[in-house]
């Protein structure tokens, strides 16, 4: 192996390590912002972050997503509610992955907040699944559980819509930073 090949491999390893550390920091950032914003029930930046990271890092955006989910479990305790986080947040990642990568900006400015709001609106129903299984709810009881939390889901949707307006500008900034840093 030549010296140039060794240097090239070393640079590639450094780049991958930097990217992994950066994605880990993003997961911690998600968790920290959720704690700071906890005074506002169901209003947070998590959906926005997941969408921005997915647009910029594609499948690697699952790293900060699951770091966030794991930190939530450690901080608040691993309970029935936490099980839903294992699929509810990655669902937003999956929906974002399915969106066209090259949407016109005007379309993206409308689509991203709507997707974020929709995810916030259905979040309670997604969380009802493990609750219904764990507590042996009937279908009617599950619907009642969802209905009881609907006001929180509407709040979640409104917050997600507002923060969803930042998805496109922040993803453009992140792409520019990635391009200029040459480390990611």
Role assignments for model-derived ranges:
Residues 60, 85-95, 155, 159, ...:
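Core segments of alpha-helical transmembrane spans in multipass integral membrane proteins
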Residues 2-56, 60-68:
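Hydrophobic transmembrane alpha-helices
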Residues 21, 25, 29-32, 67, ...:
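Lipid-exposed faces of alpha-helical membrane segments in multi-pass integral membrane proteins
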Residues 82-83, 105-184:
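Membrane-embedded alpha-helical hairpins and interfacial helices in multi-pass inner-membrane proteins
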Residues 31-44, 67-102:
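Interfacial aromatic-anchored transmembrane helix boundaries in multi-pass membrane proteins
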Residues 55-58, 95-104, 170-178:
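Structural signal for the C-terminal ends of transmembrane alpha-helices
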